[in-house]
């Protein structure tokens, strides 16, 4: 292991932040920076009429990844 959070782990973590009973039909991810083992991820959720955005951020509020679920 290279001690990085991999893409599948990011998606799994973002999925845990979805509202209950949310059905995913489509997913799109924008990877912004690498997260390493031991980094703290701060999730933010924004719901729209078309879906839900989850941003997993560092301690300064900068995103590691932004995931759009529809």
Label every model-predicted segment:
Residues 26-46:
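Active-site beta-strand->loop segment that positions catalytic residues and contacts the acyl thioester
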Residues 36-37, 46-70:
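HotDog/MaoC-like acyl-thioester-processing domains
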Residues 1-25:
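Hot-dog-fold acyl-thioester-processing enzymes
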Residues 9-13, 31, 44-46, 52-55:
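Broad hydrophobic/π-residue packing in well-ordered secondary structure
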Residues 14-23, 32-33, 62-70:
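A signal for specific C-terminal beta-sheet/loop modules enriched in small/flexible residues
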Residues 4-8, 42-44, 69:
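Surface-exposed beta-strand edges and their flanking turn/coil or helix-capping segments
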């Amino acid at each position: 292991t290279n001690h990085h959070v991999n893409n599948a782990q990011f998606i799994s973590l973002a999925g845990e932040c979805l509202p209950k009973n949310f059905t995913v039909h489509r997913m799109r991810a924008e990877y912004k920076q690498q997260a390493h083992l031991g980094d703290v991820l701060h999730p933010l959720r924004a719901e729209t009429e078309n879906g839900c955005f989850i941003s997993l951020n560092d301690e300064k509020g900068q995103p590691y990844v932004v995931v759009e679920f529809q």
